[in-house]
Amino acid sequence: MSTRSRIGILLPDDSILSVYHHFDGYPEWLGVTLEEHFNTYEKASKLIDGGNMGCCYSENEYNAETGEYETTEPRTTYYGGDDEAPILSKNFDEFTRIDCWQEYIYVFVKDRWVAYSIRQKFDENYEEIIKVIVKEVEIPKKQTVE
C-alpha cells in the first residue's frame, strides 16, 4: 500500500505545475525529503519537470535476478512516457481537484514547501468530485539518531 501524493510548484501567475508521487507521501518522509533535497525553486522545478514518479529520492533498486533490493546512488525514479508529463492547474482549487487518490499535496511557494492533507468526496458513481477538504499540515523537522 502506498501513501500517494501530488507535488506542485506555484508559478508567478498563481497557476500550479504538478506531478504524481507514488510512495511514502506522508509529511514525515516526503515533506522532510522535499525540504532537505529540493529546497530551492530551481531544484523543485527540475524535480517536477521530470513528470510523474514513483519516488523523488530513492536509494534502492529492485534486482529481478536476485529478488532483493540493492543500495544505489540516490535518484528520482520517474515513470517516463508521454502520459506522465506535469499537469498545469490554473489555480489552487483546480490543483486540489486532480484525482490521483492522493492523501497529501505539497506546493513549493516562494522559498519553502507547504504541505496539506486532502480528502476528496465523490458523487455516488465516483465520476465527479463534489467536495474537497484541504487542511495545512506541518512538515516535521528531520529526525537524527545519535
Could you tell me what each predicted segment is?
Residues 36-146:
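Low-complexity intrinsically disordered segments
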Residues 31-35:
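All-alpha amphipathic helical-bundle segments outside canonical DNA-binding/catalytic cores
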Residues 1-26, 30:
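Short, extreme N-terminal segment that most often corresponds to the first beta-strand
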